Amino acid sequence: MSTTNLLEFDRDGLADFCARLGEKRFRATQLFRWIHQRGASDFDAMSDLARALRDKLKGCARVQAPPVISGQASADGSVKWLFDVGAGNAVEAVFIPEDERGTLCVSSQAGCAVGCRFCSTGHQGFSRNLSSGEIIAQLWFAEHALRRRLKTEDRVISNLVMMGMGEPLQNLAALLPALRVMLDDHGYGLSRRRVTVSTSGVVPMIDRLARDCPVALAVSLHAPNDALRDQLVPLNRKYPIDELLQACKRYLAHAPRDFITFEYCMLDGVNDQIGHARQLVELVGRAAIRCKFNLIPFNPFPASGLLRSAHDQILAFAQVLGAAGIVTTVRKTRGDDIAAACGQLAGDVRDRTRVAERMAKQRTMQLQLQLNSSRRAEPSAAGVIGCGESI
């Protein structure tokens, strides 16, 4: 007999489910607390629920995360789990412990259709959106697994970032109920300031998120001009930088923070020159947008054909931004020994969009162009990419 996974529901949805069982809607709050605050999956353990309700639930419902294929711990304390979401697809979630907080990085899709050049997930293509339950299950499993491991009843995960596999705003219908569970005081009680949705720039959905469930927003910028961003983040061809920045300004009217975080992956010789930093200063100044920059050292993977910027170059880049009064941080790479760092999450994806095939063809063409160019160019000029030039 088919049963309903209660992880799929926010509290209102769970109240509707209880009403369909002939139960009072307030029972949903009791049930919701058992599931999310206590991590219970056994209805018999839910001692303050009436026996009749528990018997009904056993016949028609379940509380179940996707099967865990593997769990890996990094030398720095980060933990990565690989979840089997069926049909040959697997997604990853990563816990990153720090002195004052514990952050969980959560996936929203099996694969990603955006196809950013520097992202391992994008090179795998796209299979499907995750359901609300599959998104929240990553938090449900991680929080309670970590509590058991640490032998504590205190909350372990204080921050959550939608920065795992997938573009969250291309799965907004499932994302919104999951966010409501994260924020619900009867669920995980996370602050809106401590839940961050990262997007490559789906402009209409930024506006919808602002209206329906504003949380902290991070934008994957990665380039100071459209010519370069078109190459690194193909979605830019649909929603160019000026449109994106205007959407960010509109978002700030609803956001729990008074700034937007711009993520910027530092790619050697591609987007990391001092001229690029000066262009960024001019860009955000012209847009008059309150922001901070998070510079991310690139985590190489074979298919990318890209290299990490030198540490001194990253610091020099940050200094230009900082001198202009822009708060700038350099992300500390965590979990790279278990392929859990930024841009490395890949899981397993059964590509239904042929994105991976197209990207492979593009890589072949780029390599051929580079070979042809190097044969024609002077040795000292080969392979150099100037500020603002496309790749």
Curated annotation (Swiss-Prot):
Cysteines paired by S-S bonds: C105-C342
Name of the gene: rlmN
Gene Ontology molecular functions: 4 iron, 4 sulfur cluster binding; metal ion binding; rRNA (adenine(2503)-C2-)-methyltransferase activity; rRNA binding; tRNA (adenine(37)-C2)-methyltransferase activity; tRNA binding
Protein localization: Cytoplasm
EC number: 2.1.1.192
Positions bound to S-adenosyl-L-methionine: G166, E167, S198, S220, L221, H222, N299
Cofactor: [4Fe-4S] cluster
Keyword annotations: 4Fe-4S, Cytoplasm, Disulfide bond, Iron, Iron-sulfur, Metal-binding, Methyltransferase, rRNA processing, S-adenosyl-L-methionine, Transferase, tRNA processing
Lineage, highest ranks first: Bacteria, Pseudomonadati, Pseudomonadota, Betaproteobacteria, Burkholderiales
Cofactor note: Binds 1 [4Fe-4S] cluster. The cluster is coordinated with 3 cysteines and an exchangeable S-adenosyl-L-methionine.
Chief location of this protein within or outside the cell: cytoplasm
Annotated catalysed reactions: adenosine(2503) in 23S rRNA + 2 reduced [2Fe-2S]-[ferredoxin] + 2 S-adenosyl-L-methionine = 2-methyladenosine(2503) in 23S rRNA + 5'-deoxyadenosine + L-methionine + 2 oxidized [2Fe-2S]-[ferredoxin] + S-adenosyl-L-homocysteine; adenosine(37) in tRNA + 2 reduced [2Fe-2S]-[ferredoxin] + 2 S-adenosyl-L-methionine = 2-methyladenosine(37) in tRNA + 5'-deoxyadenosine + L-methionine + 2 oxidized [2Fe-2S]-[ferredoxin] + S-adenosyl-L-homocysteine
CDD domains per record: Radical_SAM
InterPro entries: Aldolase_TIM, Methyltransferase_A, RlmN_N, RNA_MTrfase_RlmN, rRNA_lsu_MTrfase_RlmN/Cfr, rSAM
Cited function: Specifically methylates position 2 of adenine 2503 in 23S rRNA and position 2 of adenine 37 in tRNAs. m2A2503 modification seems to play a crucial role in the proofreading step occurring at the peptidyl transferase center and thus would serve to optimize ribosomal fidelity.
SUPFAM superfamilies xrefs: Radical SAM enzymes
Organism: Verminephrobacter eiseniae (strain EF01-2)
Protein's UniProt keywords contain rRNA processing: yes
Protein known as: Dual-specificity RNA methyltransferase RlmN
Biological process terms in GO annotation: rRNA base methylation; tRNA methylation
Domain Radical SAM core intervals: 98-337
Coiled coil: none
Enzyme class at the top of the EC tree: transferase
Comment field (misc): Reaction proceeds by a ping-pong mechanism involving intermediate methylation of a conserved cysteine residue.
GO cellular component: cytoplasm
